[in-house]
Amino acid sequence: MTMITDSLAVVLQRRDWENPGVTQLNRLAAHPPFASWRNSEEARTDRPSQQLRSLNGEWQFVWFPAPEAVPESWLECDLPDADTVVVPSNWQMHGYDAPIYTNVTYPITVNPPFVPAENPTGCYSLTFNIDECWLQEGQTRIIFDGVNSAFHLWCNGRWVGYGQDSRLPSEFDLSAFLRAGKNRLAVMVLRWSDGSYLEDQDMWRMSGIFRDVSLLHKPTTQISDFHVATRFNDDFSRAVLEAEVQMYGELRDELRVTVSLWQGETQVASGTAPFGGEIIDERGGYADRVTLRLNVENPALWSAEIPNIYRAVVELHTADGTLIEAEACDVGFREVRIENGLLLLNGKPLLIRGVNRHEHHPLHGQVMDEQTMVQDILLMKQNNFNAVRCSHYPNHPLWYTLCDRYGLYVVDEANIETHGMVPMNRLTDDPRWLPAMSERVTRMVLRDRNHPSVIIWSLGNESGHGANHDALYRWIKSVDPSRPVQYEGGGADTTATDIICPMYARVDEDQPFPAVPKWSIKKWLSLPGELRPLILCEYAHAMGNSLGGFAKYWQAFRQYPRLQGGFVWDWVDQSLIKYDENGNPWSAYGGDFGDTPNDRQFCMNGLVFADRTPHPALTEAKHQQQFFQFRLSGRTIEVTSEYLFRHSDNELLHWTVALDGKPLASGEVPLDVAPQGKQVIELPELPQPESAGQLWLTVHVVQPNATAWSEAGHISAWQQWRLAENLSVTLPTASHAIPHLTTSEMDFCIELGNKRWQFNRQSGFLSQMWIGDEKQLLTPLRDQFTRAPLDNDIGVSEATRIDPNAWVERWKAAGHYQAEAALLQCTADTLADAVLITTAHAWQHQGKTLFISRKTYRIDGSGQMAITVDVEVASDTPHPARIGLTCQLAQVAERVNWLGLGPQENYPDRLTAACFDRWDLPLSDMYTPYVFPSENGLRCGTRELNYGPHQWRGDFQFNISRYSQQQLMETSHRHLLHAEEGTWLNIDGFHMGIGGDDSWSPSVSAEFQLSAGRYHYQLVWCQK
């Protein structure tokens, strides 16, 4: 029967969720994940424990607009209108309430610690049976791995406890509440709590029991905590595994702890000791603890390159060997320290090839499953990432085990962000909020400190710098001196961080913001008295079509040893699947659920789409981060390994020499390179081509054998060089045919055989082409100076907030999008063997000339049309996005063939990963389906393009798809795009870079802006 102290009314009156001093009630102390094996062999092999029972599955659920609307009767029995939902899940993904996407602005009125009276509340209940033996002895716990944002728990009508911090476990002792037969859990989850003020991360705001729920049965006398650490001699030839074990229960003389260390099936070391801790101070030590030290000779060291894993089994038993319970964890022998301004792993300076990762799934919201986690890790490893930052909260417990075993360095980050506070450190400098912050930091450390993959602790994200940070920094350094601590808030270089860890600092450009300047990363290292390493906690904002200038960072990382890399923002687009009226899925972003406030598509900054399909930018990241570097001198290739610990034992170097994409010679050489070593490869005498063209040498590093994270044939690195070619002059082919010019009042018409070209004399544009009776154009060939805005072009501009510095606003204000052509010249001349059309246009807006474009079209007897373009850009207009031509072709061909850089989309400031070759792709693959439509699909360095009956030659950039720039610009979501008639072709002589240092300020480097004032390009258009 429910007692008065268990009643819902008492809980509602107490309002624990509006008290920063109450972060939990009756929650058990933090510890590493437990399984309570009763067989040490099962613990060693990590088999499922019979003492750990999942409660995942279907639960009863009722949603209420506020906790006060929940009836008292719900504590005892399910309500008649209860629905069924799957746990774990976010209730917004089941149609209850709406997810809210906001970056900085809090989704509730800022009045800490109070939350709105309309506080959506989810009431979960589950009826389950308990094993009879669990009731007879021992302790039965319930573990909630993640509940957003706070909850009260009842069991069989009796109140059990309260928990908040949505990203760490809340664990309660159920022993006194359980009974034989059926038992009923009731969990009241509140969407908002005072904890929400500490969880203002840039992500969807969702609610519910979104991580696993389980029951754990422990013996009455039990292991309550254990911590393992590794120590080494100077050359890492000898190690000590230090294990501190703590017990709970009756402290009996006969109790013993045995710690055994295993490498596969082999026991490496073992030790046994009674309880009784080492002397701490004048009052002695802890009677319920013991520290064992196991010596290990020549340990196999752990790193992300070679994740050697041992297994430590901790047995609590009696003196005669009777096992009470066993716990276990993976062990990696590794040492992390900072020395002489460098972050070292096992004595070697790390280069962090990192990425920030939110826990996100397009169908399941913030629910993570093992398949998705493994998929993320495999993709990261395959694309040369070696590190991940858990942005911005502790992740699902399984994530760390997977990172241990596959090999990724982890920055484990506390669930603290107060980005929307003014000032930002309003809470983090307030002692009333220290208990809440302390719980979030200390419990993270106590849960995760046994994982070798965790090499850095983070105090949180974007919360200013307050006294609470300093206190928690000191606590971590006291409890775990084996790892550095980082924290970006307050300027990235405060006393609360061992690492200078700025976000979006640029390579050479200072950003002197008041109070918290962002110096260039090169300058930061040289500031007076600054001796710390610099690792960017966020950089290269990968929003939409982005990552321009990424190579510049990596040039700096390799040039300056204390610039030790960074973490790209971020891994995965946070779009969510919605369904239209016909049941078709589409990708939604902020505002699509009627959510306010919202930050629109700013939730989509990923290197991969939400379904984990790669963005083209991922290839650029892979190439810049590759572990092999190459240098060509004559016929000698020098290969340098950037692996710190791994000897190349599964790599072949394939080389190919090709002329305009046609292979002339190739070979294969095994790579045998020591860590940080070099290998010199001498190529044979290379063939000299007899015909004109571009001669390229391409090398690929291929892994012939499958690995834990890649299939056989995986390409891990590549490089290309253009070789010197013999001078070759191609004489024009003599043609006896002469094109015929006909002049009318409206047009110039040129005919040659079955081909015709028509130039409109009033517009001055090529208005139509015919092959036989078939028209080739749906729109005239016109100049183009604009692009459908990228996220980086838009910046923070939106309907209600205009950023006049954003590229798109500057282009709009100058009239680039509205410019109209005024004809200055349109003449035709018949030459001895060709017809020459000469045109000139002034592109104007509101009477002001922005661009002058002069063109000649020379149509010769072979049917080739040579187009020469000269453009002048007005000195007082913004640098244009592109200088090129556009038209709508009538043809819709299946495939596109080109000689140039590819195969993936590339742009002038994001093309180091692209290779020059002859490429052939389906037309559909030439379009990149960014959820927020924008300019996409460009291919640079093109010498020849073939599409349908047409061929273009020259030196240009192009994109080709069924969507016009106008449609891309006017459409909010990709699923709303419709394939237009024909095919849109954009051929650019010049295209501005895309930028990507960040997405809220102009970030295209000066060398990739179109600032010259005068431009010249030419191409040939013919029919095959």
UniProtKB/Swiss-Prot annotation:
Keyword Magnesium, does the record have it?
Answer: yes
EC numbers on record: 3.2.1.23
User: Catalytic activity, per the record?
Assistant: Hydrolysis of terminal non-reducing beta-D-galactose residues in beta-D-galactosides
Q: Which cofactor does it need?
A: Mg(2+); Na(+)
Task: State whether keyword Magnesium applies.
Answer: yes
* PANTHER family hit by this protein: BETA-GALACTOSIDASE
Protein name (Swiss-Prot/TrEMBL): Beta-galactosidase
Which species is this UniProt entry from?
Escherichia coli O127:H6 (strain E2348/69 / EPEC)
Gene behind this protein? lacZ
